[in-house]
A protein has these predicted regions:
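Enrichment for repetitive, rod-forming helical segments
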Residues: 9-13, 26, 267
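Alpha-helical and His/Cys-centered functional microenvironments
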Residues: 9, 23, 146
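N-terminal pre-domains immediately preceding structured catalytic cores
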Residues: 2, 33-259, 263-339
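Bacterial N-terminal signal peptides
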Residues: 21-32
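N-terminal secretory signal peptides that target proteins for export/translocation
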Residues: 1-16
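Residue-identity detector for glycine
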Residues: 18-21, 57
């Protein structure tokens, strides 16, 4: 599939680690010694990929799960499409109830972003994508927003389910990347994991509170935001952030390259399996994945794509306000280098 972002499977088995990690947004070379990967304490995990926990039931690192190709999803019939739209409308109401950090998007802006989403999908040979949810992120410095979209058939326009502020890569500091642009597939080939909720040396819970899910999109080419620029491999993830110190900063660029989201949005995407189509296919094949909690209310319309664009908007819209004046005062020294 031309132009689609490709990831490198450089982490066949990621060991568990005890101290708080941060999002992996720089290149790292893992050297195996006698067939055994280096342990976390042998590497600076604050500048590399945070390892997944080990499945306590099987003893098998979650990252070794083999992906299963989901069954192809045929176009929905008129009756099924109408049912899907009703489900989407119900999920929109659920989003309003469950996600505390929300943005109110004007109708014309909803439409414009839906058009931009379709254009980006078409550029990556996904023009016909329909019948599933898609996550869209605008990394523009003046916007910093995430949108969840759905359409039942390729003949429908993309419909907004909900929007929330994010924080993407802030250039200008060593090891900080611009959040990469493109269409990224959320697949068990880069297995998700969950936050330990412990603090790093700067007093920051880089992945948020305990049990927050880290959506791992693998190794991608990232544009360096320091020095002379250029590109390097970076580990691209979407995850929650410190709820006490950094979540209030959502709405401005503040990460090392990954997409930071609110805890309530993290839980919403997780609980309803918004981008878990490939994970659910793996479960349907008979695999048990510790990263998927029991009791989830997974939508039958789960998708698998996170799309990142840059609208290059010059001014900040009223619907995407800046964080409050006191937000930066809550960040401890060194807190702005934690992802």
């Amino acid at each position: 599939m031309k132009n689609r972002q490709k990831t490198l499977a450089l982490l066949p088995a990621r060991p568990a680690f005890g101290r708080a990690g941060v999002c992996a947004c720089v290149a790292v070379l893992l050297i195996a010694c006698a067939g055994n990967p280096l342990h976390a304490e042998q590497l600076d995990w604050e500048a590399s990929a945070a390892p997944a926990s080990v499945d306590a039931g099987s003893g098998e690192p979650a990252s070794t799960a083999a992906a299963v190709t989901p069954p192809s999803r045929p176009p929905l019939s008129a009756e099924d499409a109408a049912s899907a739209m009703r489900r989407a409308a119900a999920l929109r109401q659920t989003f309003t109830r469950e996600v505390t950090r929300r943005l109110t998007i004007p109708a014309d802006v909803q439409h414009a972003y839906g058009v931009r989403l379709q254009q980006t999908l078409a550029e990556h040979d996904l023009a016909g994508l329909a019948g599933e949810y898609v996550v869209l992120v605008d990394r523009a410095a003046t916007v910093q927003a995430l949108f969840i979209y759905f359409r039942a058939t390729r003949g429908n326009a993309w419909t907004l389910i909900g929007a929330s502020p994010v924080a993407t890569g802030l250039p200008g500091t060593y090891d900080h990347f611009l959040t990469p642009l493109g269409v990224f597939e959320h697949t068990p080939g880069n297995m998700d994991f969950r936050a330990e909720g412990t603090m790093n040396q700067n007093g920051i819970r880089g992945y948020g509170r305990h049990d927050m899910r880290i959506y791992d999109l693998g190794w991608v080419d990232g544009e360096r935001g320091w020095g002379k620029g250029g590109t390097s491999k970076m580990r691209f993830q979407m995850h929650a952030t410190d709820p006490d110190r950094l979540e209030s900063l959502l709405g401005i660029r503040h990460s090392k390259g990954c997409v930071r989201i609110a805890a309530s949005l993290n839980e919403f995407i997780d609980r309803h399996g918004i981008i878990d189509a490939d994970y659910e296919a793996l479960v349907a094949s008979g695999r048990s994945l510790w990263v998927l909690h029991p009791g989830r209310e997974v939508t039958p319309l789960a998708g698998r794509y996170i799309v990142v664009i840059d609208s290059q908007r010059k001014t900040r819209p009223a619907w995407s306000p800046l964080p409050g004046r006191t937000a930066l005062k809550q960040v401890p020294k060194g807190g702005d280098v934690a992802d």
